[in-house]
């Protein structure tokens, strides 16, 4: 089995065999990610990170992943202090970074930015989030978390909760879940429902889904609850954000006697109470760690 992609732009570019290849390779990478083994596979290779939007987990896990593989990292994690402040456009910045590095990881506020850059440079490009568009590497670590926790991906029932309109993590995740015959339950305020074009795509993919408003009533009816924060920065009107803020909050009381796996791409705001953290089925911090072996697998597959 081989990995067929040269760039990681959208989960929709993946074949099921690509997904399975990365998940299997990530498991091989885990001992290296945990410092139990040393790897020199990417000695002498440089990863360029271009982060136009804030990031903690994605940026740090990519940097960790590259260094665990034996490579190194250069780049920026904010516009301040770069020529972007002087008016340099994405095209020029990407051209320059591509001259210095063996691959680029890009986070940008414009949907389609990663695809655009992949078409103009000669090195592999990884989409680390493009506005409200896609976040394919998050999707891969989400799948890996589910598989490592439950032992399989097929025939599960998964609830996606919160900001389904602007959340790029769920926009990516649903297409991958559809590959594995997963039933999806969408739970959100009516103002933040999954975009209709994505629902139409799921229908074409014969993916079973339902749309609901109550989180509490559905906790024990699913295998996984995937919480998301309400993304304040995506709202054109702050008043609209205040209308939906805090509508869904998981507490240990809600989850009493429940074995449902709790996931979250993080950061959280108020949607998961801190008293949930110590529950055995709270997987979001382990989920964040799994970003390292998964991104190691992706980097290893596209950097030659």
UniProtKB/Swiss-Prot annotation:
Pathway the protein contributes to: Pyrimidine metabolism; UMP biosynthesis via de novo pathway; (S)-dihydroorotate from bicarbonate: step 2/3
Residues the entry annotates as binding carbamoyl phosphate: 57-58, 107, 135, 138, 266-267
Family membership: Belongs to the aspartate/ornithine carbamoyltransferase superfamily. ATCase family.
Keywords, alphabetical: Pyrimidine biosynthesis, Transferase
GO molecular function, one term: amino acid binding
Keyword Lipid metabolism: no
Pfam families the record matches: OTCace, OTCace_N
Lineage of the species this protein comes from: Archaea, Methanobacteriati, Methanobacteriota, Methanomada group, Methanobacteria
Reactions mediated catalytically: carbamoyl phosphate + L-aspartate = N-carbamoyl-L-aspartate + phosphate + H(+)
Summary of the function given for this chain in its UniProt record: Catalyzes the condensation of carbamoyl phosphate and aspartate to form carbamoyl aspartate and inorganic phosphate, the committed step in the de novo pyrimidine nucleotide biosynthesis pathway.
Organism: Methanosphaera stadtmanae (strain ATCC 43021 / DSM 3091 / JCM 11832 / MCB-3)
Top EC class of this enzyme: transferase
EC code(s) of this entry: 2.1.3.2
One example of a Gene Ontology biological process annotation: amino acid metabolic process
Binding positions (L-aspartate): 86, 168, 229
Gene from which this protein is expressed: pyrB
Known partners and oligomeric status: Heterooligomer of catalytic and regulatory chains.
Name assigned to this protein: Aspartate carbamoyltransferase catalytic subunit
């Amino acid at each position: 089995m081989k990995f067929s992609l040269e760039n990681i732009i959208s989960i929709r570019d993946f074949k099921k065999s690509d997904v399975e290849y990365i998940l299997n390779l990530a498991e091989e990478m885990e001992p290296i990610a945990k410092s139990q083994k040393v790897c020199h596979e990417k000695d002498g290779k440089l990863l360029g990170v271009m982060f136009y939007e804030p990031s903690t987990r994605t940026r740090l896990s990519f940097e960790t992943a590259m260094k665990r593989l034996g490579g190194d990292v250069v780049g920026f994690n904010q516009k301040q202090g770069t020529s972007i402040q002087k008016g340099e456009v994405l095209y020029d910045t990407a051209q320059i970074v591509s001259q210095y590095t063996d691959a680029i990881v890009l986070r940008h506020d414009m949907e389609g930015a990663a695809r655009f850059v992949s078409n103009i440079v000669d090195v592999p490009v990884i989409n680390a989030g493009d506005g409200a568009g896609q976040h394919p590497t998050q999707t891969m670590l989400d799948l890996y978390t589910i598989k490592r926790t439950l032992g399989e991906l097929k025939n599960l029932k998964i609830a996606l909760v919160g900001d389904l309109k602007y959340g790029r993590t769920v926009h990516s995740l649903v297409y991958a879940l559809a590959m594995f015959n997963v039933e999806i339950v969408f739970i959100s305020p009516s103002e933040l429902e999954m975009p209709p074009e994505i629902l139409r795509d799921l229908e074409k993919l014969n993916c079973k889904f339902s749309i609901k408003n109550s989180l509490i009533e559905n906790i024990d009816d699913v295998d996984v609850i995937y919480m998301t924060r309400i993304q304040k920065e995506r709202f054109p009107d702050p008043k609209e954000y205040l209308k939906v803020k805090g509508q869904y909050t998981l507490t240990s009381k809600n989850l009493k006697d429940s074995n449902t796996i709790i996931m979250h791409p993080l950061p959280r705001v108020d949607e998961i109470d801190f008293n949930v953290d110590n529950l055995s089925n709270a997987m979001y911090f382990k989920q964040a760690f799994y970003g390292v072996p998964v991104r190691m697998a992706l980097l290893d597959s596209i950097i030659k």
